[in-house]
Design a protein with these regions (language model features):
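Short hydrophobic alpha-helical membrane-embedded segments
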Residues: 5-12, 29-39
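Generic transmembrane alpha-helix motif of multi-pass integral membrane proteins
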Residues: 38-49, 57-62
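Acidic, glycine/proline-rich intrinsically disordered low-complexity segments
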Residues: 1-4, 70-78
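Short, amphipathic, aromatic/basic-enriched membrane-interface segments that mark the entry/exit
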Residues: 20-32
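Alpha-helical transmembrane segments and their membrane-interface exit regions
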Residues: 17-18, 61-70
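A cytosolic-side transmembrane-helix exit/cap motif
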Residues: 29-32, 52-61, 74-76
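An acidic/histidine-cluster motif and surrounding catalytic segment
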Residues: 76-174, 178-321
Length: 321
């Protein structure tokens, strides 16, 4: 019997055991690779072959991981299609934001996006003096800046594009500064996220900025002010076809090509859409802003983005589900 091989296997098990109970983040990073799980299975087979006791130890370690992180985390060769349930992806990008376009298109080369229809939506530029933002709206009282209305218009245009499509039922809408930095924490497909959501959902928010962590997996977000200041961000969200068409029936006039806004809602994109559509914020965001993100709309919000991101990352590191 090759005892040096057994010693090596035992050493690897001890390291994994320590990582599991001391540093869950390391285990998450390790186990999120198909190679990691493949090695784990090889360890079990090797132990079972050379020493039944060691095989049992390895099996206990892996079953402990399964108990903590759940069935869907047991993705041996990364076979979970995390974007399952999403029929189309739209990303909103200003014509002048060339660098952002390059970065997000590079992100789309990741395997998780393979086979998904992806469409760029030309954002309305509120800083362009020739852009007649207000001519595209029917409003009685201007409540916000031209930049805010341009942002809202960009999202409404995207939703209208989706509503008019005939092939898709669920769309993922992204702003062009989204990242998949949180991918290493993903455990469920978006189909599962949608199936587990309250039955009346119209939007599911997959990126958020808030002053505190959420308690429930799904939090109704009608943008009521709370002690944390609300749950903001239109960075990433799922919208279903029924909701998109309902919204366009209410707001969009194809004859005049204008959107009518209710006067009793704040005319900021997240405030407005979360008020008029049944929106739930998913506690475990899939997308997040880069740490050095400078918003084209609110560059002064950088510090709040950083603080919120830190809280979310801490939540994931402490996560046991």
């Amino acid at each position: 019997m090759n005892y040096s091989f057994l010693v090596l296997l035992l050493f690897i098990s001890v390291v994994l055991f320590i990582l599991f109970y001391i540093n869950k983040e390391a285990v998450i990073l390790y186990s999120n690779t198909g190679l990691g799980k493949f090695i784990a299975i090889i360890l079990i087979l090797s132990y079972a072959t050379f020493h039944i006791g060691m095989g049992i130890v390895a099996l206990i370690i892996l079953l402990s991981y399964y108990k903590v992180y759940g069935y869907e985390s047991w993705n041996i060769l990364n076979t979970i299609d995390f974007l399952d349930g999403i029929d189309v992806i739209y990303y909103i990008n200003l014509e002048r934001s060339k660098e952002r376009k390059t970065i997000i298109e590079e992100m789309f080369k990741d395997n998780i996006f393979y086979g998904k229809p992806i469409q760029r939506i030309d954002a309305i530029d509120g800083k362009d003096p020739t852009e007649q933002v207000y001519d595209k709206l029917v409003i009685n009282t201007k409540r916000n800046s031209k930049l805010e209305y341009a942002c809202l218009l960009s999202h409404l245009t995207t939703i209208r594009t989706f509503a008019e499509s005939t092939l898709y039922e669920n769309a993922l809408i992204l702003e062009d500064d989204m990242t998949i930095e949180l991918k290493k924490f993903w455990r469920k497909s978006l189909r599962t996220v949608m199936e587990n959501a309250p039955a009346d959902w119209e939007i599911i928010q997959l990126c958020y900025i808030t002053g505190g962590l959420l308690k429930s997996d799904y939090t109704l977000n009608n943008y009521q002010r709370n002690r944390y200041g609300g749950i903001a961000s239109m960075g990433a969200y799922i919208i279903n076809k029924t909701a998109a068409r309902k919204l366009m029936t209410e707001m969009y006039d194809p004859v005049t090509n204008k959107f009518s806004l209710r006067d009793y809602h704040t005319h900021e994109a997240d405030h407005y859409l979360f008020k008029v559509l049944r929106t739930y914020t998913y506690k475990y965001p899939y997308f997040i802003y880069p740490t050095d993100n400078t918003s084209t709309l609110h560059p002064e919000h950088l510090n709040s983005h950083i603080r919120s991101k830190s809280r979310i990352e801490y939540m994931y590191y402490q996560l046991s589900y």
